Amino acid sequence: MKTTTAQPSPSTSDFSGHTPMMAQYLGLKANHPDTLLFYRMGDFYELFWADAEKAARLLDITLTQRGQSAGQPVVMCGVPFHAVDTYLARLIKLGESVAICEQVGEVGASKGPVERKVVRVVTPGTLTDSELLNDKSESLLLAVHAGTRNFCGLAWLSVTGAELRLAECPADALEAWIARIAPSELLYSAEVTPAFEQRLKAARAATPFTLSIRPAWQFDGGLGERKLSEQMGSNSLAAWNAESLANAHAAAAALLGYAEHTQGRALSHVQRLSVERDGDLVELPPTTRRNLELVQTLRGEDSPTLFSLLDTCMTGMGSRLLKRWLLSPRRDRGEAQARLEAIAALQSTVLGGTAAPWRTLREQLKNTSDVERIAARIALRQVRPRELLALRLALAKAEQLAPALPASGELLGGIIERLAPPSGCADLLASAIKPDPSALVRDGGVIATGHDAELDELRAISENCDDFLLKLEVSERERTGISNLRVQFNRVHGFYIEVTQSALSKVPDNYRRRQTLKNAERFITPELKAFEDKALSAQDRALAREKWLYEQLLDALQPSVPALTQLAGAIATLDALCALAERSHTLHWRAPSFVSHPCIEIQQGRHPVVEARLAEKSSGGFIANDTQLGPQQRMQVITGPNMGGKSTYMRQVAIIVLLASIGSHVPAAACRLGPIDAIHTRIGAADDLANAQSTFMLEMTEAAQILHSATAQSLVLMDEIGRGTSTFDGLALAAGIAAQLHDRSKAFTLFATHYFELTEFPATHHCAVNMHVSATEAGRDIVFLHEMQPGPASKSYGIQVARLAGMPAAVVNHARQALEALESQHAQTRAQVDLFAPPPAAETPMASAVESALAALDPDAMTPREALDALYALQKLNTRERGAA
């Protein structure tokens, strides 16, 4: 990459001495000091000084130098306007923000540079362009307020969505909330404590996002409440149960202010408000989402995951909604039950053997455009002509959906009601937009013929130019008798009549010479000059007229935005339900049933992703297994060889519970599920070097979090806990953790271990049972049967697994001999230690003199003076005690 010597940016407060254009640039840059400013100049967006150096480095484009301003070299680089989306995408991916500055004035309309202004700011959390967005994922902007009373306020939205969400969470749960929301950008106050800021930065390790600092005054609860009321068009937030959330209101104030600033206007399309509270959702900590590979594999890939298996949606709207369902299962079974009933209706076939409704509906949904995002871009006045054409086609498709939809149940009935397109919208789009419009309004060719008489006339002048010239040429030849006279046009000299040297004597008096050539002369006539003025201006006037008409069209579409947003929600819900119906049919899943008593009962359960991968590779069928957990059997202690299927079994149970909780059918012959409040997992191990945490430290940290959080309604997966330290340490810790989960948390627990000593745990803990994954030996080889069977495993088969992995024969033989010696020695010296005995009760310490004196005080009966005297007395007593000690 070509570079020049780095130059500091000029002062943005003193523009004296700068050229008019650079003074204009610096004035705009002063309002966006921390943002790259794309300054439109003709066919390029230019960047100057420090912005240019940064952009050139990040984008690997040429950095150059052109002239001077105020005695300083003007360092610059640029990108073509027609390719700007490509460069924006690269910058946004790097966490940068870009202010887009356009020419808004007419060239030559005033002295000095053409008028320019920043029309929008593109940041990672406020993306609106379809080229910059992922069809299947929301780009969320989150604001966090440090809050009071040890609570944090959160407010978040997608600028291209229609819903704003609020929450207040305990300060110690903030990281979990951030991880679940998974924002693209997080806003926080410039006046938070260093410790709080460090927590936000640390949270990026689990969920990468851009941090943006905002002035503290923007986080104002009163301002937020007013903004929310205005946004919802109401004097009170009581209808949304959002009136007493001062911390969340403060976050919403900053959120809305920032979003409006970046878009250059209010978010009129955001008209839904919801409040999420602790206890509403089934908790899925970051470790659970990672270990179950819900939306990303352990290698960071998008497939194969549970979401990639589920997502056969026909629209981006449906995919995004399905992902939200998957990551936000609700404890209240009402929504899940409604979805199960809807899936049943979509799968039912009417008498006569016609196709199930989900098949017909999916065909109709195919190629439906993203109505949700198009509606948002209409409201933000950023929609492109071809998106409006796509919207018209989507509205036509929507009209076909309701008749094919069974009116069964409240959920499907509500979808039918919301599928009604806004009145007159499709007709307006059909009359206004060409069937094949240009990509951009600035290119013309967008407004349909017949929509505006003045535009049609201007187009006719421009389009009929060739016909006029041909007719003029014929008439002039007849009038002058010059047979080779030609009427033509070029961009330099405009329209002209060309006559060869031999015919110049026949040129009429009204011909005025325009250009002399070697063998000919070119002339202009008053008639041709008048046409030239009209024709050349007609194209510019037609383009200006089209731009004006397009703005008028956007004005006319604004009242339809709420109905379009409602329609988008209905299409998304229907699409997601049809995808679940298709998955159930194709993968042979069954509907779960919900019960009020605690249980997880699964017959012939399967891991859906592993099963699908086996089918792809033709590697044989998946071995299904039963699971029985209830009040009398809350824990399974699972033993068996590596590669035997312990982790797969544990994960499949969690996935089946999760799928049932979102209202999906499940990969099992049958499933009964009681109340579930969380799914916790401690599976696998990896160092966190960035945060100076070893494998074992991470293991213990995650286990501690589970022990503090798990309840009797939680599902806990513990896989090989205690591996990262010495054998005795690990065994002792594993025993203690198992006892805590069994005796105190009473959570449904799948506890996989290689510590054979733990198979004695169920003997003293009546709600625990031993289970093992079966395997058999064939000579010196091992055959994995992948079946869960009662009782402990007879051996771990570690040496056989090492042999299968390709370990050198000498190493395997040495290990086998060493194992035999160790087992013999262990059998002779094994101590009878009760790993599962409760710890001895701690002695109750005697109360100190200070504690006794403090307990004797009655603060309510004391005057302020008496309280102060008592405090001094306690201080003296404490000093004496410390001295005696």
UniProtKB/Swiss-Prot annotation:
GO CC annotation: cytosol
InterPro entries xref list: DNA_mismatch_repair_MutS, DNA_mismatch_repair_MutS-lik_N, DNA_mismatch_repair_MutS/MSH, DNA_mismatch_repair_MutS_C, DNA_mismatch_repair_MutS_clamp, DNA_mismatch_repair_MutS_core, DNA_mismatch_repair_MutS_N, DNA_mismatch_repair_MutS_sf
Residues annotated to bind ATP: 640-647
SUPFAM superfamilies: DNA repair protein MutS, domain I, DNA repair protein MutS, domain II, DNA repair protein MutS, domain III, P-loop containing nucleoside triphosphate hydrolases
Pfam families: MutS_I, MutS_II, MutS_III, MutS_IV, MutS_V
Any single GO BP term: mismatch repair
PROSITE patterns: DNA_MISMATCH_REPAIR_2
Keywords: ATP-binding, DNA damage, DNA repair, DNA-binding, Nucleotide-binding
SMART domains, alphabetized: MUTSac, MUTSd
Highest rank taxon of the organism: Bacteria
Gene Ontology MF terms in the entry: ATP binding; ATP-dependent DNA damage sensor activity; damaged DNA binding; mismatched DNA binding
Assigned protein family: Belongs to the DNA mismatch repair MutS family.
Function: This protein is involved in the repair of mismatches in DNA. It is possible that it carries out the mismatch recognition step. This protein has a weak ATPase activity.
Name the record gives this protein: DNA mismatch repair protein MutS
Source organism of this protein record: Variovorax paradoxus (strain S110)
